């Protein structure tokens, strides 16, 4: 559920859920999809950026579906970069 509306549901689950599994996915979702949203908004100002923005958007839809399926099955998975940052952020909050 943390991935349903991208970073929006990630923030909501981070605020209201205490399960370590859910909180990890909430942070990972927030970091991943807020970065992708920023890229999709900012890329079109660059030459050729509109096309690149569309590629990023297509990739994000595939990634979004992958994340929803994996998390709904209860599978623990880390996305490159963002998963490591999420783990680090959560460990800082619990120590």
From Swiss-Prot:
<dbReference type="GO" id="GO:0005886">
    <property type="term" value="C:plasma membrane"/>
</dbReference>
<keyword id="KW-1133">Transmembrane helix</keyword>
<comment type="similarity">
    <text>Belongs to the UPF0132 family.</text>
</comment>
<keyword id="KW-0812">Transmembrane</keyword>
<keyword id="KW-1003">Cell membrane</keyword>
<feature type="transmembrane region" description="Helical">
    <location>
        <begin position="2"/>
        <end position="22"/>
    </location>
</feature>
<keyword id="KW-0472">Membrane</keyword>
<feature type="transmembrane region" description="Helical">
    <location>
        <begin position="32"/>
        <end position="52"/>
    </location>
</feature>
<protein>
    <recommendedName>
        <fullName>UPF0132 membrane protein AF_0736</fullName>
    </recommendedName>
</protein>
<feature type="transmembrane region" description="Helical">
    <location>
        <begin position="55"/>
        <end position="75"/>
    </location>
</feature>
